[in-house]
Amino acid sequence: MLKKFLKGSQAPDPQSKPKESEEILEEQIDAGIKEFKRSNRNLFVSAFTAGLEIGFSVLLMGTLYSLFVGKVSPESMSLLLAISYPIGFIFVIIGRSELFTEHTALALLPVLNGSVTLRNLLILWTIVYVGNIIGGLLFTLLLVQIGPSVGFIQVDSFYHLAKKMVDYDWNTILFSALLAGWMMGLLGWLVT
């Protein structure tokens, strides 16, 4: 359904019957199996691209922080940054890149179904995770070097954004990550 939406097709027919949960699960398993059939190289390039695309969230948040710090209330700043956060995820969805949080659920289904081995799952997860990290790091290095030099991002915006992300104890960060992964899996289920 999301693919149809992105292609600009019309809304689903209201007369059509909703899919049964078994049909959705089968589609999710098939989608997961297709990921395992991709070459490691293509999977890595897609994951690397997703890491770069997610960086646009930080770029936009850092730019907005630099432009509006001290000019708007802290509450307005928090809202502005929260609204701008999803842009990188939108790029990932439109670009059909491979983000690790998507694979935590989607790739697990064929393993639970017995279609794919646990070893293959770990290989896929490693490729996607490493690709995401390398893409994200490269984007970050470029952003940190170029942003302040050109003047569209102040250095203190990086400190502000990082502090907001890691200013919690480890278990809060862990459970937040688990919740985010679960929500991405749920999103995959809902758009099917």
Regions found by a protein language model. Name each.
Residues L2-T192:
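Alpha-helical transmembrane segments and their helix-helix packing motifs
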